[in-house]
Amino acid sequence: KRSDRETSNGCVLVKAVDGFAAMIAVKCETDFVANGKDFIAMVQEILDAAVAAKAKSLDEVKGLKLANGEDAAATVQQRSGITGEKMELDGYNFIEGENLSVYDHMGKHTLATIVQLNKKNEEAGHKVAMQVAAMKPVALDEASVPQEVKDEEYKVAIQKTKEEQVEKAVVAAIKKAGINANLVDSEEHIESNINKGWLTREDADKAIEIKKTVGAEKAANLNENMIQNIAKGRLNKFFKDNCLVDQEFQFSDGDKMNVADWLKSQDKDLAVVAYKRFTLSAE
């Protein structure tokens, strides 16, 4: 059944005209269709109509009338019928305002970005649009990260830190007992190392007992302040890796600096205001 088939190929196009930038994605099943000029021309026509209408949603785009007298959604379905491939008009992003830069990654029509700066600077805008493509930020800055994402990341960081502290104590106790901790790091390894003669059953039992008792004891006596401080450090690293302005800028000729500082180095008042990114590939 065509509706059950996977649409992992397609075409993403992006365009900016007079203070309005938009990108659109139409998915299909094979790169043969995705790279066909008729398919790309159809996506371009839908994008042109969306930009001309300054469309504000995917639903609005689907309803736009094209040159054939049909709306965009029907046109995609007709093309699907002609090629025999499932197709979906399923991605639309836009930014309205001045100082917009658009980027089609390597001209391959599979990944596109839009960036808006607070001042006109085409070269800087282009480089930041490339940064967004390469480094896939999840938010503009720390304040833009949804609270539930922050809470979840912090929770994961706390859990990971606790597990590491317990593991550290267990490994130290196993070493102190004169046992090689690498030989007893999992039940599977324990059995295989006994069979190879690298580990005695007695040492294995001792290590299992240490894991149980020292692990439980350490877990019950963790230093909460220390755990929270380490977790906060991890959360800050998450912001640094995932917030556009805090990411290390990838296209600087000189010193390492984050995106916000690089923009200031080009013009002390220059800053990024917004961005959009869409890709066909799973990341």
Go through each PLM region and give its residues.
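N-terminal assembly/interaction segments in proteins that build large macromolecular machines
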Residues: 1-283
